[in-house]
From Swiss-Prot:
Pfam families associated with the record: AAA (PF00004)
GO cellular component, one term: chloroplast
Cellular location(s): Plastid, Chloroplast
UniProt keyword annotations, A-Z: ATP-binding, Chloroplast, Nucleotide-binding, Plastid
Protein known as: Uncharacterized AAA domain-containing protein ycf46
Length: 506
């Protein structure tokens, strides 16, 4: 087995070969400038050099701002702190051997007029030569004037097979092994981390626990939370809400239960398509967000929440880069749940006309991914105002289903009261008259029911006694439900849903 085959085995056959295949194709087609977006600088450099050795004889040089050309045999350290001189070296390279140059962190210099002009000139001349520039950068920031000259290639983070190989290697070096089930849990917990991050986390685990065990998974989750928070657009949730914690919504619950095994290997072998997602439309406080959290728990999948407001940046092109970053990260973590709360606030009709096309481009990128994605990312989007959503979002093929979550009926309200009271008073919940409470809370949302219980608790707490059914009834009388304060809007939404244009969750 040669060196390239060993690396192929180590990094995982499918993903590694996909990247190598694309990279080889770009080299053969003489693409002058390749931009590889990755945090794993050492890993991608190692993979590129090894892949090149397997099919071509090329001189490979690498440059960075501090050390210059560190492996130039004629002038080690050439072009230190001088990106323009680094490009001139490529231009003047006269050896007959084909050349590949790795420029690290070079995205930081692309807005310099001298550097960008030199790159554009090189892009023209390199098409007729066996020279290729590879920019390795953690951020995807390409000025518009270079967009035609540069080809983007994403280097994926390791998938489960790669992570497992690395964990087995580390286990072997430490001289002990985890049970298969514990190993699988650790692999799943490590999804979305680079191999270097995984090594560091394992070092921290060993320093803390003296061994790799089930309890050490918390450190992996904390590392992942920190990594996700650095994106500033995604938030990692550890879902604790169960589907049984939600009152009513029986149709929606049945739909979710029916598809609980859709991400399994058995479903894939059967030929079932990967589920795309759900759009939950309805009145505020009816449990849309709670449902999103419960799906992750029910299906035992990680939950990412997208802050749609932070997708939009002030710099031209920044918003588009952020949505691509979001997609790339979600696909790396997959299988997972991507929760997009109040999507209607981001993609309203007015936004499409007021920001020079940014919303339109971001929406276009998102909607294309939603329709064409092959990765097991299940999108759960919630919306309060159906009228403000673009019609393209509601077309068949975007989501597997669109559900309307309305105000709970009499039986559902009683169920909601029971759910909350069981959680608050697990031993004495049955002493409360949920039938009367349900009858006296007509047009209340689930959130308003919950708030009335807590209001009753506050009153009883200040009087140093246990709260009663009467306390809750008094709290209900003091609350003016949203169904009355926004009566017209809610009735229009209910009429639209009852006309058969959307599937009802109850």
């Amino acid at each position: 087995m040669n060196n390239f085959e060993l690396i192929l085995l180590y990094y995982g056959k499918k993903i590694f070969m996909s990247f190598v295949k694309d990279f080889k194709l770009l080299l053969k087609a003489r693409y002058p400038i390749i931009y590889i977006n990755t945090y794993e600088e050492e890993r991608v450099e190692y993979v590129i050099k090894s892949a090149i050795q397997s099919f071509t004889n090329r001189a490979v040089y690498s440059w960075d701002f501090i050390e210059g050309y560190c492996n130039n045999p004629n002038d080690n350290g050439y072009a230190i702190r001088n990106p323009l001189q680094a490009l001139e070296f490529i231009d003047k390279f006269t050896l007959e051997t084909p050349l590949l140059v790795l420029l690290k962190d070079f995205h930081l210099f692309l807005n310099d007029i001298s550097v960008s002009r030199k790159l554009r000139n090189l892009a023209k001349s390199l098409r007729n030569q066996s020279k290729t520039i590879v920019i390795i950068a953690s951020d995807l920031t390409i000025p518009l004037n270079l967009s035609d000259s540069i080809t983007i290639l994403h280097f994926p983070l390791p998938k489960n097979s790669e992570i497992k190989k690395e964990l087995l290697r580390i286990q072997e070096s430490l001289g002990y092994s985890l049970p298969e089930h514990s190993l699988d849990n650790l692999v799943k917990a490590s999804q979305g981390l680079s191999l270097e991050k995984i090594r560091r986390v394992l070092a921290k685990i060993i320093a803390t626990y003296k061994e790799i065990n089930v309890e050490s998974l918390d450190l992996v989750f904390k590392e992942k939370q920190q990594l996700i928070s650095q994106t500033q657009i995604l938030e990692f949730y550890n879902p604790v809400t169960k589907i049984s914690d939600i009152g009513g919504l029986n149709e929606l619950k049945s739909w979710l239960k029916f598809r609980a095994a859709s991400f399994s290997k058995r479903a894939e072998e059967y030929g079932l398509p990967i589920p795309k997602g759900l759009l939950l439309v309805g009145i505020q406080g009816t449990g849309k967000s709670l449902t999103a959290k419960s799906i992750a728990n029910e299906w035992n999948l990680p939950l990412l929440k997208l802050d749609v407001g932070r997708l939009f940046g002030g710099i031209i092109g920044e918003s588009e880069a952020r949505v691509r970053q979001m997609i790339q990260f979600a696909e790396t973590i997959s299988p997972c749940i991507l929760w997009i709360d109040e999507i209607d606030k981001a993609f309203t009709g007015s936004n499409f006309n007021n920001d020079s096309g940014t919303t339109k481009r971001v929406f276009g990128t998102f909607i294309t991914w939603l329709s064409e994605k092959k990765s097991p990312v299940f999108v759960v989007a919630t919306a309060n105002n159906i009228d403000s959503l673009p019609p393209e979002l509601l077309r068949k093929g975007r989501f597997d289903e669109v559900f309307f979550i309305g105000l709970p009926d009499l039986k559902e309200r009683e169920c909601i009261f029971k759910v909350h009271l069981k959680k608050i008073r697990p031993k004495s919940w049955s002493t409360y008259d949920t039938e009367i409470l349900s009858a006296q809370s007509n047009r209340f949302s689930g959130a308003e029911i919950e708030e009335s219980i807590y209001e009753a608790m506050h009153i009883a707490f200040n009087e140093n006694r246990e709260f009663t059914t009467s306390d809750i009834l008094n709290s209900l009388k003091r609350v003016v439900p949203l169904a009355y304060t926004s009566q017209k809007n809610i009735e229009e939404l209910e009429d639209w849903a009852s006309a058969g244009k959307i599937r009802l969750a109850s």
